[in-house]
Amino acid sequence: EAVFIDTPSLTYGGGPQSWLAQWGLAGRDQLAAHLVLSPTYSSAQSEHYLRLARCEQLASIIWTKLDEACNYGSLVNMAHASGLPVSALTYGPELTGGMAAASGKALWKLLFKRQLPGQYPDADAAA
């Protein structure tokens, strides 16, 4: 079971650690924070968000707005810079209909064939 909470701006009240403490969520074992980034951000913007979002619970990156990007090199760059795995890929106007697990196959097809997960039938299959 998962609950998604869209948090306030990363600069709100001292960053994610302060926000989590304020809402009584700090120190919870099963809490995971995921940084949502767009490949349309510049490298400087993505690195800025990563610096602001760093907290004990930061577990992965979710790439969003993939359908709006003209290239996907930032996915590789941020994976290296952050040391975080990619957990999900989102594209299109719907959250649930346009979200796929970030499997190896989905990432390879996106990077090398420029295919979004919704453009082939076995997008969620691990490979």
Features from the language model and the residues they span:
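Residues immediately C-terminal
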Residues: 10, 42, 68
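Conserved ATPase-coupling elements of RecA-like P-loop NTPase cores
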Residues: 12-19, 45-48, 71-74
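NTP-binding/hydrolysis catalytic cores, primarily Walker-type P-loop NTPases
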Residues: 79-127
